[in-house]
Design a protein with these regions (language model features):
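N-terminal cap/lid segment of alpha/beta-hydrolase-fold proteins
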Residues: 1-28
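Short, surface-exposed "cap/lid" segments of acyl-processing enzymes
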Residues: 18, 28-60, 65-70
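Aromatic pocket-lining residues of Rossmann-like dinucleotide-binding sites
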Residues: 59, 114-115
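Gly/Ala-rich beta-loop-alpha elbow adjacent to hydrolase catalytic centers
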Residues: 103-107, 111
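The alpha/beta-hydrolase serine catalytic core
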Residues: 9, 19, 118-222, 226-250
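Short beta-to-alpha linker loops that shape the active-site pocket of alpha/beta-hydrolase fold enzymes
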Residues: 42, 69-73, 130, 226
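Catalytic nucleophile-loop/oxyanion-hole region of alpha/beta-hydrolase
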Residues: 67-98
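Short beta-strand immediately N-terminal to the catalytic nucleophile in serine-hydrolase-like folds
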Residues: 101-103, 127
Length: 250
């Protein structure tokens, strides 16, 4: 049996404050083992309801795994900056290692942008990731909430995830990014698109379109009956990611 190493809690100075992170060290001792960096989704966290930890322990058999929390801003541009900051930290700490990005939902959008800008990123996982942010947030915020932002008003959210104020800048910011174009230009680096068949937030059709737009090598995994958060299918999704990582990294 492989003995799991203790996770390391640390932080790195980011453009908007300290970025808290957890590193699951690879069970193989070599420092040049690959690194998987995981970015969480909209209003999420690096814990991901326990699903992120399960994947980190699995992937730790072949890679160091870095999970981190965005600093509270929901602006995609700021999240991209913070992710790029984490990538820079990883490059310094694990010099010469292959780096793969995994983004969950909106974290996948940040990962797609960051990886498209950085040819040193060796692979990308889009986990329940939208390619049409306007349509996605019209769906998730509801028409009235979306129109408030579009009309220049703040939107106040208060639910089981806590309180959040979205400003009109949120919509203006996501309009800066043409994810369809980035996907169309993604070539020669491995891509995994993993999506739930019953995703209620980002319809499966978006995941399928992302897959078809990208160049080879690529893989599409659709998890039957899985919702946007993979609530009852987190282990299955993690195992699919691990299988893909084994294929591209070993």
């Amino acid at each position: 049996m492989i003995e799991l190493k203790k996770d390391e809690e640390t932080s790195v100075k980011g453009p908007y404050g300290e970025i808290d992170m957890v590193i699951t060290p690879c069970t193989v001792k070599e420092n040049t083992q690959p690194v998987l960096i995981m970015a969480h989704g909209f209003r999420g966290s690096m814990e991901g309801g326990g699903r992120a930890k399960y994947l980190a322990d699995l992937a730790g058999e072949i890679a160091h795994v870095v999970r981190f929390n965005f600093n509270g801003s929901q602006l995609l541009s700021r999240q991209i900056e913070e992710l790029e900051n984490v990538v820079s930290y990883v490059k310094q700490r694990y010099a010469g290692s292959k780096i793969v990005l995994l983004g969950r939902s909106m974290g996948g959008c940040a990962s797609l942008v960051a990886a498209s800008r950085d040819a040193e990123i060796r692979g990308l996982v889009l986990w329940a990731t939208p390619n049409d942010l306007q349509l996605t947030f019209l769906n998730s915020l509801g028409k009235s909430g979306y129109l408030k932002l579009k009309n220049g008003e703040n939107l106040y959210l208060n639910d089981e995830r806590g309180e959040l104020v979205l400003t009109p800048d949120f919509l203006h910011d996501i309009n800066k990014y043409d994810l369809i174009e980035l996907l169309s230009n993604w070539k020669k680096r491995p891509l995994l698109v993993i999506h739930g068949a019953k995703d209620e937030t980002v319809p499966l059709e978006q995941g399928q379109q992302s897959y078809f737009l990208a160049g080879l090598p690529k893989r599409l995994v659709v998890i039957p009956n899985a919702d946007h958060s993979f609530t009852n299918h987190g282990h299955k999704a993690a195992e699919e990611v691990f299988s893909w990582l084994q294929h591209i990294l070993i």
